[in-house]
Amino acid sequence: MNRRILSTVEELDSILRELDSVAETSDDELRRLFMTFSMEYPVNAEKDPYSHEYKTAQSALYERLSGKPYTPANEESAFDVGEAVFQPFPYLTKSPRTVGNHIIAVGNVIRHIQSPPPSTILEFGPGWGNTTLMLARMGYQVTAVDIEKRFIELIQKRAAQKSVEIECIHGDFSFISDTSRKWDTILFFECFHHCFEHQELISWLDGVVNEGGQVIFAAEPITDLFPVPWGFRLDGESLRAIRKFGWCELGFQEGYFRDLLHRHGWSVKRTDFTDTPVGTVFTATRLSDQNSGRTPTSLEGSEASRSKCQ
């Protein structure tokens, strides 16, 4: 498939107008068209991913693409809560492929949770609440934190439908920066890449995870194929999300991601599951917990280890 390399936001706007009309009729066709265009990274990018200059350059790139400065308040999603109660994503797409891939991915995430119910789970960015509801129905004590009020309202209504309890908190990733609470599992499922201040977020994790606990990063764009250590993704789908909605759409090189976690005392294991395009899971456990034998689960391993679920 030939891919068009865009160089201006005017070119991007022209394509997005075409995509808007396609989105009204076919989710599958929309996703296919995402693969037909992208942008390229500047060749003279700042090299140190922990430097102020690097972060400033990424902020400037975002402003160029979105037309405004980034703030977590940009992460809003407009939808009808009443309709979504009965037909949330992925069902609203009416795409067998999209629905199937999502359901498989959710199941893959759940089987990586090492502590059985009624242990505690903090889920960031639960969105439509599909994983949240499944965990609550299993008997987990789930805390769901989302910056979008409509998602919080949706999860509350869906929980009431199933007669399950879910603690819903309207907030952003900084919620864990000043809480005294701890959880057995922290879950990021397709949401960690929405955190521009991700280095700060990683520094907070140690204070909110119980001994022997874990942090799960599922279906996140973490790959050494990414052209820079971390930054805004410039593929078609990400460009649309940044330009049209103002969302933060980061990508990460795996080496950088592992180094960042290791700097804060975490070991990382990668598990690939190829039956869905969003099947890769990174599980972080404390180095100190591993050394003391406090992580009894078959899914764990050394920092550099990788495995495949069959």
Role assignments for model-derived ranges:
Residues 1-104, 231-244, 281-310:
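N-terminal accessory regions of S-adenosyl-L-methionine
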Residues 97-117:
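Conserved alpha-helix/loop element of class I SAM-dependent methyltransferases that forms part
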Residues 118-127:
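Conserved class I S-adenosyl-L-methionine
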Residues 128-175:
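Class I SAM-dependent methyltransferase SAM/SAH-binding core
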Residues 187:
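A conserved beta-strand element that flanks and buttresses the S-adenosyl-L-methionine
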Residues 190-191:
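Short catalytic micro-motifs in class I SAM-dependent methyltransferases
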Residues 199-211:
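A short glycine-rich, Lys/Arg-flanked "PGG" loop and its adjoining helix->strand segment in the class I
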Residues 218-274:
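C-terminal alpha-helical "lid/dimerization" subdomain adjacent to the S-adenosyl-L-methionine
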